[in-house]
């Protein structure tokens, strides 16, 4: 009986040949399967973590893009609101400048017209005084004798002067337009 018992033990006992090889791969395969499943689980957890991180980063980027788009939209609305006011101010400024330039031109033209009329009036006044002084008989013997007459119509003065100096008379006839404001 001892031998019989030994034989089954010997059969069950590990030998250097086949039985050890069969047990080791079974142990190794189960260990590798466990390791693989553990790695898969770790990888799947890593993948899930990466996916969550990617989703969160995407959410942050979308949020910042939405914020930027909203800010741009607000600025565009403000600009559309303020642009007509700026254009109206610019138009009003240009109108004011044009009005000032026109006023300056009209004022300058008025001064020039006034100066020309005043100059014409002063010439006329001088001629009238000369005629009046000589008409009244205030003649100077050294200058000679001045005789003259004038006629005033609605728009001009007709002047005829005769100056007697030396040998012969000098006759001056002139029509002077009168400065009439319209």
Swiss-Prot record:
UniProt key word Repeat: yes
GO BP, one annotated term: positive regulation of flagellated sperm motility involved in capacitation
Family annotation (SMART domains): IQ
Composition bias type Basic and acidic residues, residue spans: 1-10, 31-43
The keyword S-adenosyl-L-methionine is annotated on this UniProt entry: no
InterPro entries xref list: IQ_motif_EF-hand-BS, IQCF, P-loop_NTPase
Compartments (UniProt record): Cytoplasmic vesicle, Secretory vesicle, Acrosome
This protein's GO CC annotations: acrosomal vesicle
Region described as Disordered: spans on this chain: 1-43
Annotated PANTHER family: IQ DOMAIN-CONTAINING PROTEIN F1, IQ MOTIF CONTAINING F
Subunit structure, interactors included: Interacts with calmodulin.
Role description: Involved in sperm capacitation and acrosome reaction.
Record-given protein name: IQ domain-containing protein F1
Organism: Mus musculus (Mouse)
Gene name tied to this protein: Iqcf1
């Amino acid at each position: 009986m001892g031998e019989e018992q030994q034989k089954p033990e010997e059969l069950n006992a590990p030998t250097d040949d086949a039985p050890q090889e069969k047990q080791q791969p079974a142990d190794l395969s189960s260990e590798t399967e466990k390791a693989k499943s553990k790695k898969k689980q770790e990888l799947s957890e890593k993948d899930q973590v990466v996916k969550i991180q990617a989703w969160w980063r995407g959410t942050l980027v979308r949020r910042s893009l939405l914020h930027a788009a909203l800010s741009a939209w607000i600025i565009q609305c403000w600009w559309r609101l303020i642009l007509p006011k700026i254009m109206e101010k610019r138009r009003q400024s240009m109108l004011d400048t044009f009005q000032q330039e026109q006023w300056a031109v009209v004022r300058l033209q008025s001064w020039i017209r006034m100066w020309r009329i005043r100059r014409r009036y002063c010439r006329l006044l001088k001629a009238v005084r000369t005629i009046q002084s000589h008409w009244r008989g205030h003649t100077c013997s050294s200058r000679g004798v001045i005789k003259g007459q004038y006629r005033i119509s609605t728009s001009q003065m007709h002047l005829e002067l005769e100056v007697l100096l030396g040998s012969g008379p000098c006759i001056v006839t002139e029509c002077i337009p009168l400065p009439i404001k319209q």
